[in-house]
Amino acid sequence: MIAILVSGAVGLLVSLFGTPLFIRFLVKRQYGQFIRQDGPTAHFTKRGTPTMGGVVIIAATVLGYTVANISAQRMPQVSGLLLLFLMIGLGVIGFLDDFIKISRQRSLGLNARWKIIGQGVIGVTFSVLALQFPNEQFRTPASTQVSFIRDTGIDLAFAGAAVGLVLFVIWANFLITAWSNAVNLTDGLDGLATGVSVFVFSAYVVVTMWQSNQSCQVLSQVGPSCYETRDPRDLAIVTAAIVGACAGFLWWNASPAKIFMGDTGALALGGALAGLSILTRTEFLAVIIGGLFVVIVLSDVIQIGFFKMTRRRVFKMAPLHHHFELSGWNEVTIVIRFWLIAALFVALGVGIFYAEWVVG
């Protein structure tokens, strides 16, 4: 418990006090956000706002995790390291995307093909490694079974280990891409994606702590309600650091934002959420916990699909938050109300998680 608190506190302090230093660094070098011409006109005033703030979020997370392990005199575990690898790897892809936008002063960053290849390499590496490193109980960080609140029994390795590995890599990469894009689409208003991330990752602190206390590896009497998650305490430490890092960053990212997280932060946080859902065996529960992200993605999919079929639009602009902007809602009002919706999704997800344990 102490290590989790230390991790969150260090992540918060590093982000809170490190972000203004990073802002000065970016302003000095004139690394500012380029605003799309086809976006809401109110956003033109944000042109030049420093971006790539995800660098601070990632750094604060790594430092929080490291200091917590040192203070608790514990060794990092493979699950936590895999989660950090996925977060940092996707953050690097996002950083390259942001840097190209800034250096070339355009809204298009990294070439789509190279972006997909980069995400694919990181995703495949994570997926393959997640099925390695069995512990004394022969549990690997991830499972080839599709999961809801725990493994469901739907095993992707139904036709053998080789087929299972291939299908798992495809499934995991789908989740990684989906969640990364979801957070990226949500990052359209000051503080929106950051605030929602605080709620969502806080839920996963609760989930991982509960899994740690009810782990099949620590309970004297193993029953059907215990969890077979590998290294849940280590995942809780990483997740607490992410919560602290996002909370500290939100101080500077809230309206009017002094800095944006950019693709650096959005891809990193999306990757971390995907990784957590895989490593905690909560792949479909994450859809509920991260429900606001899902709603944002669906609004974009509906808009594009409906327009292609009818040449008409469902929303004034997609994603959904831009629709409300063009409807005359104040940006802060939209953000706060979306935070409330995100909190309701999180409460529902955590409630379902706990109810399953009680019933099970």
Swiss-Prot record:
EC identifiers of the protein: 2.7.8.13
Reaction(s) catalysed (UniProt annotation): UDP-N-acetyl-alpha-D-muramoyl-L-alanyl-gamma-D-glutamyl-meso-2,6-diaminopimeloyl-D-alanyl-D-alanine + di-trans,octa-cis-undecaprenyl phosphate = di-trans,octa-cis-undecaprenyl diphospho-N-acetyl-alpha-D-muramoyl-L-alanyl-D-glutamyl-meso-2,6-diaminopimeloyl-D-alanyl-D-alanine + UMP
GO biological process, one term: cell division
Domain of life: Bacteria
Compartmental location: Cell membrane
GO MF terms, alphabetically ordered: metal ion binding; phospho-N-acetylmuramoyl-pentapeptide-transferase activity; UDP-N-acetylmuramoyl-L-alanyl-D-glutamyl-meso-2,6-diaminopimelyl-D-alanyl-D-alanine:undecaprenyl-phosphate transferase activity
Keywords, comma-separated and alphabetical: Cell cycle, Cell division, Cell membrane, Cell shape, Cell wall biogenesis/degradation, Magnesium, Membrane, Metal-binding, Peptidoglycan synthesis, Transferase, Transmembrane, Transmembrane helix
Pathway linked to the protein: Cell wall biogenesis; peptidoglycan biosynthesis
Cofactor(s) listed in the protein's UniProt record: Mg(2+)
UniProt topology in membrane: Multi-pass membrane protein
Protein name (Swiss-Prot/TrEMBL): Phospho-N-acetylmuramoyl-pentapeptide-transferase
